[in-house]
A protein has these predicted regions:
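Bacterial N-terminal signal peptides that target proteins for export
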Residues: 1-11
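Basic, polyanion-binding surface patches
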Residues: 26-204
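Intrinsic disorder/low-complexity segments
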Residues: 1-3, 19, 71
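Bacterial N-terminal signal peptides
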Residues: 10-22
Length: 204
């Protein structure tokens, strides 16, 4: 009986130690996703509805190989400006990602085939408190320009920043923006960032 109990306790101790042993061995939380990205001409082969593209939620990322951050966005616009295909995003003053946008010449916007949990986490946690991508087990990749994006995405647009300007409340011409910031403006007014789409990637 004593031998049997000893073996039982030894088995339990071994099972409890496995997570720690895995971390010490450097085992990643998740395996790298399969599939590769292929570039495509956004002016010729982009069929998504621009009026619902942002409403369903995207991830916005900025930074470099040293440090980066991402956040969930649902405001944005797509179109043509100064003869270039452009994406416009809006980021509130107190968002951590804004610090990276303000010092980066490029940013990316991404969609995920199954990204509800990713978008939810990225939207409810701040990168000031820790590495959100690492917490989610996301695998960070970089474009030739050093712009971050995630291997788990299914569509990536890399944008070169052309213009940035904060909203001016004195310029509001209707109660829609006034009421929004009166009720939900704790993070401050938004800054508008317009970027030229310089690279579009689709997961194969």
């Amino acid at each position: 009986m004593k031998v049997s109990r000893f073996l039982h306790l030894l088995l339990v101790a071994t099972l409890l130690a496995l997570p720690t042993l895995s971390m010490l061995a450097g085992t990643p939380k998740t395996a790298a996703p399969t599939g590769t990205f292929k570039a495509f001409p956004v002016n010729e082969d982009f069929t998504l509805n621009p009026f619902t593209y942002f409403r369903e939620g995207l991830l916005l990322a900025a930074g470099d190989r040293e440090k980066s951050n991402a956040m969930t966005i649902s405001w944005g616009a797509m179109g043509t400006l100064w003869g270039r295909p452009t994406v416009t995003v809006y980021v509130a003053e107190r968002r951590y990602t804004k610090e990276f946008l303000d010092r980066s010449p490029y940013f990316t916007v991404m969609t995920f085939a199954e990204g509800d949990s990713i978008l939810r986490y990225m939207g409810h946690h701040s990168g000031r408190d820790g590495d959100k991508a690492a917490a989610l087990g996301l695998h960070t990749l970089y474009t030739d320009n050093g712009t971050p994006y995630y291997a788990e995405a299914d569509l990536v647009l890399e944008c070169r920043l052309l213009y940035a300007a904060p909203f001016d409340s004195a310029a509001f011409k209707d109660d829609v923006p006034r009421e929004h910031y009166a009720k939900r403006g704790k993070a401050g007014l938004h800054t508008m960032y317009i970027g030229e789409v310089v690279r579009a990637l689709r997961k194969e």
